């Protein structure tokens, strides 16, 4: 860190500005806006300084070190390098903070680029290394930060003391303010400059805050690549006080959770269910009843084979407020990163997503429907039952030469794609690791042309031939 960011209160404090040109005019405008008691030293000044008449002292003379007496800050804004150097050296000897415009080496402080929503201020600086980049960032921030933020900040200051009296806990106050600032109702009142109604709304919210139940937001984390996280999902995980997350949520996405949030792993893995669903349901209710803003973070989309609906049923029965933020499901994300389109005019007019897990009481899906051609079949969590899936599809008419792919860790740096035919599915599944997605259909053949993401290609090996009832050679797993 080359510079320590800090905000200086200059109201009524003495500041010396050396120079009278356009650059000095810009600095004068900024310093006077901050309330500085400004003294300007320059033989000549721009006519535009007239707009500040009566607000500064103009000494019509050349700079000498004597001008520094009693000053708090010094700014040199001339086009004379010798004068600027003299200002810097003289101020430095007296231990004064000095800025030489556009000369970081001769500045003990610098002016950042400012986004002004007074009293809310945002400052951006590159330490003088990349002013164009700073300007672009400032323009972006200006467009992102609504104009009503200043009024909202003023209003918050008026209610702050009452919030401390009503809510003794820091976490309770933080929760109250986060919800208030995220409220569309409050934002609407501020935008209309209806300050009285806005203040009433905040005070009413404080009166209710102590007895408030929290809320749960069901958030889809997408297939793994943090760049595929939706903007709304990012906002929710950065506002959450408690995050209950699944096994499939990538570490890169968990790194985006705010640092003081409580992280609770409720992950499950095939063959090793570490947290029962009932316990997850209990935790959701418990944390929400304690008044927390809870995010239930699930890989992919929360309503796609993720028990999202079941969890919301529990919350609804318990009277817990909830909302849902959809995510990109693995079937869409992983196939795209593998270069496999789910539908294609020549190869697939439909796509079907199923889970490889057994249904209740061993009920089987409609294999006849799943085995039709010109259809892409995507199977979640299907590795452990791959041999059964293979046999059922072939026995119901799906060709054993149908192209298939198994995508491991789709959309992440660990992505690997194993390809082959339906006859080889069971053996390829033995070579794959979870989490994996099975894709069956003619569209897989397009991967040779369309693969673009830097995954490793899988190789077929240790394959043993068998024969099914239709005479199709199936490569089955040798368990001997």
Curated annotation (Swiss-Prot):
Q: Which pathway does it operate in?
A: Cofactor biosynthesis; adenosylcobalamin biosynthesis; precorrin-2 from uroporphyrinogen III: step 1/1; Cofactor biosynthesis; adenosylcobalamin biosynthesis; sirohydrochlorin from precorrin-2: step 1/1; Porphyrin-containing compound metabolism; siroheme biosynthesis; precorrin-2 from uroporphyrinogen III: step 1/1; Porphyrin-containing compound metabolism; siroheme biosynthesis; siroheme from sirohydrochlorin: step 1/1
Q: Where does NAD(+) bind?
A: 22-23, 43-44
Q: Which ranges form a coiled coil?
A: none
Task: Show the catalytic activity.
Answer: uroporphyrinogen III + 2 S-adenosyl-L-methionine = precorrin-2 + 2 S-adenosyl-L-homocysteine + H(+); precorrin-2 + NAD(+) = sirohydrochlorin + NADH + 2 H(+); siroheme + 2 H(+) = sirohydrochlorin + Fe(2+)
Q: Where is this region: Uroporphyrinogen-III C-methyltransferase?
A: 214-480
Q: Binding positions for S-adenosyl-L-methionine?
A: 223, 299-301, 329-330, 381, 410
Disulphides? none
Keywords per UniProt? Cobalamin biosynthesis, Lyase, Methyltransferase, Multifunctional enzyme, NAD, Oxidoreductase, Phosphoprotein, Porphyrin biosynthesis, S-adenosyl-L-methionine, Transferase
EC number(s) from the headed UniProt entry: 2.1.1.107, 1.3.1.76, 4.99.1.4
Offer one Pfam family short name for this entry.
Answer: Sirohm_synth_M
Ranges for the region named Precorrin-2 dehydrogenase /sirohydrochlorin ferrochelatase are 1-202
GO molecular function, a single term? sirohydrochlorin ferrochelatase activity
Q: Which GO terms describe its biological process?
A: cobalamin biosynthetic process; methylation; siroheme biosynthetic process
Where's the active site on this chain? 246, 268
User: Which residues carry the post-translational modification Phosphoserine, per the record?
Assistant: 126
Q: Which family does it belong to?
A: In the N-terminal section; belongs to the precorrin-2 dehydrogenase / sirohydrochlorin ferrochelatase family. In the C-terminal section; belongs to the precorrin methyltransferase family.
**By its UniProt entry, which PANTHER family does this protein fall under?**
SIROHEME SYNTHASE (PTHR45790:SF1), SIROHEME SYNTHASE-RELATED (PTHR45790)
Role of this protein: Then it catalyzes the NAD-dependent ring dehydrogenation of precorrin-2 to yield sirohydrochlorin. Finally, it catalyzes the ferrochelation of sirohydrochlorin to yield siroheme.
Annotated protein name in UniProt: Siroheme synthase 2
Species source reads: Aeromonas salmonicida (strain A449)
Gene label: cysG2
